Amino acid sequence: MFVGIREITSARGRFGLIAGTVALITLLVVVLTGLTAGLGKQNTSALEALDPQSVVFQDPEDISFTTSRVEARDGLTPLGASQMLMTKGNGEDAAVAILSLPKGTELPGGQQLSDEAVAAPSLEVGEGETVTVAGNDITVGAIGEDLAFSHSPVLWVPTDFWKEVMHTDADGTVLLSDHEVDGGVPLKESFSGLPAYSSEQGSLKLIQGFLYAIAALVIVAFLTVWTMQRTRDLAIL
């Protein structure tokens, strides 16, 4: 300990350099961890707010929110999900995630879905404003929670409107259940069906792993070199 304290006081610059390097690497890891979590929420916050226990896709072997289409079943809630372009009342276009549920369903913000849409605040539309999606008009009846799906703000709409927009007879993209059902997958596993979610999260976590390894190598290399330089002092002790 005496040698270590002496080295710190006599080689402040060297010690400060390695301490600063470790601090910067730590900061980078923290920032990247926050970025990974933030991007994940931008993909999944709407689904997490619904908080189903099971998600049923058209094909259990092909988990995809893009291609799945399902019919309504007793005890299960159909959820439609699509990425669309929305035109606001002032003519401005905005990318939006259209999520549909049956009328009367309670949304994460506490609103009850009716014939009117419920918009995320980040869409910057007002209550009573009429918006257009794929040539179909709908009035925004309320502003809900600021949720996102696949990196787009959410516009909650009734199932009938989603079917018109998508030109489909299907009742939704997936079925949601508050209990385990045959053919369903847990909510966390369903995230792999989001476009680019798995690759995005995998890449960021791989970078985090490399940063941890680099930080460990830098610290070990520094301590090894420093110890070897003081071998004689340690031998005397």
Name each model-derived stretch:
Residues 1, 5, 33-34, 59:
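N-terminal membrane-targeting/anchoring modules of bacterial envelope and secretion proteins
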Residues 181-217, 224-232, 236-237:
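Peri-transmembrane interface segments
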Residues 45-86, 95-97:
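Membrane-proximal extracellular/periplasmic loop immediately following the first transmembrane helix
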Residues 24-35, 215-223:
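Hydrophobic alpha-helical membrane-associated segments
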Residues 84-201:
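Basic-flanked hydrophobic alpha-helices used for secretion and membrane insertion
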Residues 1-16, 230-233:
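Feature of multi-pass inner-membrane transport and sensor proteins
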Residues 9, 14, 27-54:
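Alpha-helical transmembrane segments
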